[in-house]
């Protein structure tokens, strides 16, 4: 009796088994370009005078700062459509590999696709090459992805990530945390001040960080400083959501250190800090901003 192989008729195309490139994005460009974030932009209906036919939700404020032995990134949870709150609990900060994380501002849907694809890109590279990308390599990968959305940015669908990472090859482990920002053309910028913010509330968050930032602070102090900066941003920017004690919605925070790598803080921990900040501010209303 003739034996039929179990996988007969289900063989993957040769391209799926190729190791010619360690880039998952290059693979998608060749085999399934419709799955790239830019495809969504290209397929959106146009309106007279340019732009898109609707206003999608936008993510708002992300802050980052270095501390003694690491770096952190934090974001509020609000997304807006015009002057309307589109979401109160959007996650905008993501761990992307063992020693890096990304926060997203801008067009929410495209930004979420971009950061998920970026996470797969880093994992794919490590599986093919057997080593992870250097920190500069990770930042350059993300810059190229942002550049790939330039048409979307010109159509009003911009995405701006904020990248943080711990450089395991740094000479000084205490100063190994790094922050990299980007513009819509894919330009990447090292933020050597030790802190940065992006999004609609960035100017208020950076003003707060400028007063509170301490490069010698430990991780706990740095987390509180970041949450205070988001609180200050929400106090003046309607598109930034502050701690919501009623709904129990609090900022998202990721810390990165040599010992623990990239770790998303449990909500219970951020809730405790956020509630402490709100309580302290309510006790000294003259200093609310």
From Swiss-Prot:
Enzyme class: hydrolase
Gene3D superfamilies assigned: Glutamine Phosphoribosylpyrophosphate, subunit 1, domain 1
Record localization: Cytoplasm
Predominant localisation class: cytoplasm
Recorded metabolic or biological pathway in which this protein acts: Protein degradation; proteasomal Pup-dependent pathway
Chain positions listed as propeptide in the UniProt record: 1-59
Organism (species): Saccharomonospora viridis (strain ATCC 15386 / DSM 43017 / JCM 3036 / CCUG 5913 / NBRC 12207 / NCIMB 9602 / P101) (Thermoactinomyces viridis)
Gene Ontology terms for molecular function: threonine-type endopeptidase activity
Transport among keywords: no
Stated name of the protein: Proteasome subunit beta
């Amino acid at each position: 009796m003739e034996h039929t192989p179990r996988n007969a008729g289900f063989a993957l195309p040769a391209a799926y088994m190729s190791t010619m490139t360690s880039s998952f994005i290059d693979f998608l460009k060749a085999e399934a370009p419709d799955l790239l974030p830019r495809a969504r932009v290209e397929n959106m209906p146009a309106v007279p005078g340019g732009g898109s036919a609707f206003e999608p939700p936008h993510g708002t404020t992300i802050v980052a700062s270095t501390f003694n032995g690491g770096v952190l990134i934090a974001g509020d949870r609000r997304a807006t459509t015009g002057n309307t709150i589109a979401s109160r609990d959007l996650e905008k900060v993501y761990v992307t590999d063992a020693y890096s994380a990304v926060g997203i501002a801008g067009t929410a849907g495209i930004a979420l696709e971009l950061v998920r694809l970026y996470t797969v890109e880093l994992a794919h590279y490590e599986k093919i090459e057997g080593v992870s990308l250097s920190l500069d390599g990770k930042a350059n990968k993300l810059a190229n992805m942002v550049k790939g959305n330039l048409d979307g940015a010109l159509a009003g669908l911009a995405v701006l990530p904020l990248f943080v990472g711990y450089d395991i090859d740094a000479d000084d482990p205490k100063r190994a945390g790094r922050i990299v920002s980007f513009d819509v053309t894919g330009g990447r910028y090292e933020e050597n001040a030790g802190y940065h913010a992006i999004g609609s509330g960035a100017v208020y968050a950076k003003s707060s960080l400028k007063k509170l930032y301490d490069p010698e602070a430990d991780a706990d102090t740095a987390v509180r400083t970041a949450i205070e900066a988001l609180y200050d941003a929400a106090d003046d920017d309607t598109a930034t959501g502050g701690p919501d004690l009623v709904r129990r919605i609090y900022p998202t925070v990721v810390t990165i250190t040599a010992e623990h790598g990239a770790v998303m803080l449990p909500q219970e921990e951020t809730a405790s800090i956020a509630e402490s900040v709100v309580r302290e501010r309510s006790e000294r209303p003259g200093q609310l901003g």
